Amino acid sequence: MRTTIPVRLAERSYDVLVGPGVRAALPEVVRRLGARRAVVVSARPADWVPGTGVETLLLQARDGEPTKRLSTVEELCGEFARFGLTRSDVVVSCGGGTTTDVVGLAAALYHRGVAVVHLPTSLLAQVDASVGGKTAVNLPAGKNLVGAYWQPSAVLCDTDYLTTLPRREVLNGLGEIARCHFIGAPDLRGRSRPEQIAASVTLKAGIVAQDERDTGPRHLLNYGHTLGHALEIATGFALRHGEAVAIGTVFAGRLAGALGRLDQSGVDEHLAVVRHYGLPAALPADVDPAVLVRQMYRDKKAITGLAFVLAGPRGAELVSDVPAPVVTDVLDRMPRDSLENLVGTTEAAAP
């Protein structure tokens, strides 16, 4: 079954296709764009990308946080220029979320913007990273600190790609699906994988349509991410993004409870949802809460103090100026486990 989800924006609206075999739509997408040349940047085997129908340069990429740096973007833009890519042509990404991030930023910067089409191959990229137009790379000081908003011309979420994923990579994507439970999605537990993807994308498309530039409602998509990003950095990215967001989601429930925004049943629901998906729910034993708090002060939402997206009587919303002692106390009360056991939890969980 194929689902088409429109992302309706004031400018640069596009469709997200979800289902088996949707990558075959790529030549038609390229034709509609009027491109004469294409650069395909792929972290997957060459035969994972169908022909574009135009003269094409294939560049090999590698997924992973170490590639999310400005030097990678510079290298890609240099290859675009050597190939003679024009502003009327197209760039195609094929890979996980780090690949769509880096390629999207390169497309945003080259000639001040060239069309980009994403073929996300991981569950994480299909449910979140490839949709919405956020592109970014990391700096030593923090995650996603340099970026741009550049909407794709199409996103083709071919669910056939997911059959090749290692179990841990599936769980990585489920971390984003789990957090959707608390920001307006229906209960996705027990749904088929294509249904989970389509529901997650539909939720995100609606939020992005209201707030493309992340000045209001789009903050909701950061549920669990404030601590999640800090955990990724503190563990040297030994925790995958979805794993860290899952722990951040449990923490968000506990923090909301500590602030009187949720009763105990609401706090417990966060843990139940995360555990249902087989995701980690404890802090790594060797991570210092003080380090996490310092890192969370660097979060883009922390304008005047610590800020978190938290559940409450009116639903999830951005809560600013959260007292650091309260945050530290909640972190201190979180269960702890070794990083090896936390990663082992996701390895052993059923997809």
Swiss-Prot record:
GO terms for molecular function: 3-dehydroquinate synthase activity; metal ion binding. Its EC number is 4.2.3.-. GO terms for biological process: amino acid biosynthetic process; aromatic amino acid family biosynthetic process. This is Putative aminodehydroquinate synthase. Zn(2+) binds at residues 176, 225, 241. The gene is rifG. NAD(+) binds at residues 65-68, 97-101, 121-122, 134, 143, 161-164. Keywords: Amino-acid biosynthesis, Aromatic amino acid biosynthesis, Cobalt, Lyase, Metal-binding, NAD, Zinc. Its cofactor is NAD(+); Co(2+); Zn(2+). Disruption phenotype: Inactivation of the gene does not affect rifamycin production significantly. It holds the Pfam family DHQS_C. It comes from Amycolatopsis mediterranei (strain S699).
